[in-house]
Each structure stands twice: as structure tokens, then as C-alpha cells.
């Protein structure tokens, strides 16, 4: 799939706009539906509008074995004409939490709902202060949102890159400087722990420095109708090497560090990296977030965002539930406070044992 067209999925938006009443217009390009469903701007009308757009456009009902009709019957009786704005927000937020999806948000003027259990119920496995203080002695460089340094071992050198957010644009020129500084290293650690995602274009930039030929990045589908299984055929996603004038990694082994805090674009990056032959994932399973978000608006003006276009990895597996590491390691909070990062230590040990001859 052409990358420009792929990125258009991320900008999808659907709005509830005034008509004779309040009309929900479901775009034909996304669901193949021409009908308009009217919802009134009252508590029950807003509930029905929200339930309906999720019913027609959300992409993970089957994977999560969700009975959306049963969920409607559970929450709709909680609402009547006397329901307050804050009460309605709480009920709608609780209903959306049934999706167990960190890409789902309900936004009102006074609050934004957010499903936190995808990361809050798991070990943190990371503390940046520990790395700064006990591993780098606060001696490192930072550019384009990436902090980088070199670890010296008895038998070689290991490059280290920490990228905390895909929301920060990675400049090609900045990445040239980083790759040049790490070029004589015998291995590379890319740390994306606690990276909650951001711009998909940064995946292209980073992966392009690690490959010599075009590689598959899995596939994406979009809704073609209101049914829960109405999807297009998969569109392939691919990644190309960086331009020849750019500085690329030297080909030595690479380790990607992950934890449950890796989500959305970081999760997609982990899926692509796991498919590369010279890359090993060490740490904990990522948080998931494998569906591109879709934006909409309720009759009362509240915004709703949710997963609408599912992404699968190179083997056809959904990435919504996270990417497993090749080597599972956890770093306890107590050890991190004491200055020990078991995940980083495991990565160094692995690379030292796999240094090129």
C-alpha cells in the first residue's frame, strides 16, 4: 500500500451534523452506507448516537468477543431525560471502557475519558532516571527527541538510543548525526519503553536506517459496511531503505527494549522490528493499540475517537493485543530505584555474546 494513502486512514473523521433533527451521516467511502440516522440532542439521543457509530465502525468486536447489543442493554437503562451532563459522561465512558482500548476517548468540555488498564495493571519495567544516573552518568546527547550514548564493554562498544515518543519528529539530518556517532559500535540498543506512540511516519525514518531492501510491515483494512465483519481486503504495508546519501546502521545486531507502556505507533514499530532478521526484542509485551483511530462527534458536540482500521503483522496476526518480546525480562521497581535495570542488562549481555567476529 502506498504510504501516503496508508496515512490517510489516520485522518478519518465522522461528524454528527444538524439536519431536520440531528443526523448521523456515515460516509460511503468507509462503510458503504448511504442512509442517515437521526439522533436527538438529549441524553438518550446522545447515547444512541455513540452506541450506533461504535456498532458500525469499531473494528475489534470479533477479536475481543464483545456482545455490543448486550452492552447497550446494560447501560441504556441507566439514562433518562433527567440525566445530567456529568452523569451522562460517566455512563458513556464506562460503556466505552468495555472495549478495553486505549485508542478510545470521549471528549467533553470538562473532561476526556481514557482507558488506562492497558498499562496501569502491569509492571512499569522502566525508570529513565535510573539509566540517566546509573548507566550514563548523565553523559549523553539528545536530538530530535532521541537521547543517545555509547556503552563501553570489555570486548566492544554498544550504541544506545532512547526514543520516548513517536510524537516527536525524527529529522533525517539528526538521525545522520546519531548513526555516525554510533557507527563503530558492535551492537545497538533502541529503547522505546514507555513510548505511547505518535506519528507513523517516524517508523519509516527509523526502519529505513536498519534495512537494505524493502520489507513488509503487515497490512491494514478498513470498514466497507455496518456489519462487524464488513472489511476491505488487506492492503499491504511496506518500508523502504533510507536514501543512499543517508547514514545507515552498520548491520551489527540490534536489540529493541519494550514494556507495556509501548502503544500505538510504538507498538507498530515493535511489530515491524520483530520481523527483521538482525533485531531481537527484549523486555515485556507491548501495550497494543493496533487500530488506526477514527474521529466522530455526538449531537451535543462531544468528540469520540476509536479504533476503526485494524493492522496485522507480517504473519497476519492482529497487533491490537501487543507484541511479545523474543526474550521476556522484567525490571522490578525496587531494583530500578536501586540503580539496576534488568532489561537493559539483559540486552547488553545478549549483544556482547553476539558481537560480530
Q: Residue spans of the language-model regions?
A:
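Intrinsically disordered, low-complexity regions
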Residues: 12, 22, 28, 103, ...
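Generic hydrophobic-segment detector
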Residues: 13, 17, 22-23, 187-188, ...
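Sec-dependent bacterial lipoprotein signal peptides
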Residues: 1-31
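Flexible, low-complexity junctional segments that flank or bridge functional domains
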Residues: 32-223, 227-238, 295, 303, ...
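Low-complexity, intrinsically disordered short peptide segments enriched in small/polar/basic residues
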Residues: 9, 14-19, 128, 147, ...
Amino acid at each position: 500500500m502506498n504510504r501516503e494513502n496508508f496515512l490517510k486512514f489516520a485522518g478519518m473523521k465522522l461528524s454528527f451534523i444538524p439536519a431536520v433533527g440531528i443526523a448521523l451521516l456515515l460516509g460511503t467511502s468507509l462503510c458503504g452506507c448511504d442512509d442517515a440516522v437521526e439522533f436527538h440532542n438529549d441524553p438518550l439521543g446522545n447515547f444512541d448516537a455513540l452506541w450506533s457509530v461504535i456498532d458500525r465502525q469499531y473494528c475489534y468486536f470479533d477479536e475481543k468477543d464483545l456482545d455490543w447489543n448486550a452492552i447497550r442493554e446494560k447501560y441504556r437503562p441507566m439514562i433518562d431525560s433527567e440525566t445530567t451532563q456529568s452523569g451522562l459522561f460517566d455512563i458513556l465512558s464506562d460503556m466505552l471502557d468495555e472495549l478495553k482500548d486505549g485508542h478510545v476517548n470521549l471528549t467533553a468540555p470538562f473532561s476526556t475519558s481514557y482507558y488506562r488498564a492497558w498499562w496501569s495493571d502491569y509492571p512499569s519495567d522502566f525508570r529513565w532516571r535510573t539509566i540517566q544516573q546509573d548507566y550514563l552518568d548523565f553523559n549523553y546527547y539528545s536530538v530530535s527527541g532521541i537521547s543517545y550514548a555509547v556503552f563501553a564493554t570489555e570486548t566492544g562498544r554498544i550504541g544506545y538510543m532512547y526514543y520516548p515518543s513517536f510524537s516527536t519528529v525524527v529529522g533525517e539530518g539528526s538521525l545522520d548525526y546519531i548513526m555516525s556517532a554510533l557507527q563503530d559500535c558492535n551492537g545497538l540498543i533502541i529503547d522505546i519503553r514507555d513510548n505511547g506512540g505518535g506519528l507513523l511516519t517516524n517508523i519509516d525514518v527509523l526502519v529505513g536506517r536498519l534495512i537494505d531492501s524493502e520489507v513488509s510491515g503487515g497490512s491494514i483494512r478498513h470498514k466497507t459496511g455496518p456489519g462487524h465483519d464488513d472489511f476491505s481486503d488487506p492492503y499491504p504495508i511496506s518500508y523502504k531503505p533510507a536514501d543512499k546519501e543517508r547514514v545507515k546502521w552498520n548491520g551489527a545486531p540490534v536489540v529493541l527494549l519494550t514494556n507495556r507502556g509501548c502503544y500505538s505507533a510504538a507498538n507498530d514499530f515493535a511489530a515491524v522490528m520483530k520481523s527483521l532478521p538482525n533485531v531481537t526484542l527484549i523486555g515485556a509485551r507491548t501495550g497494543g493499540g493496533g487500530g488506526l483511530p477514527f474521529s466522530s462527534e455526538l449531537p451535543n458536540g462531544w468528540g469520540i475517537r476509536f479504533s476503526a482500521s485494524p493492522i496485522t503483522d507480517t504473519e497476519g496476526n492482529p497487533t491490537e493485543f501487543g507484541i511479545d518480546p523474543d526474550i521476556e525480562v522484567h525490571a522490578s521497581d525496587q531494583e530500578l530505584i536501586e540503580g539496576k535495570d534488568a532489561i537493559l542488562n539483559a540486552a547488553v549481555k545478549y549483544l556482547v555474546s553476539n558481537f560480530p567476529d
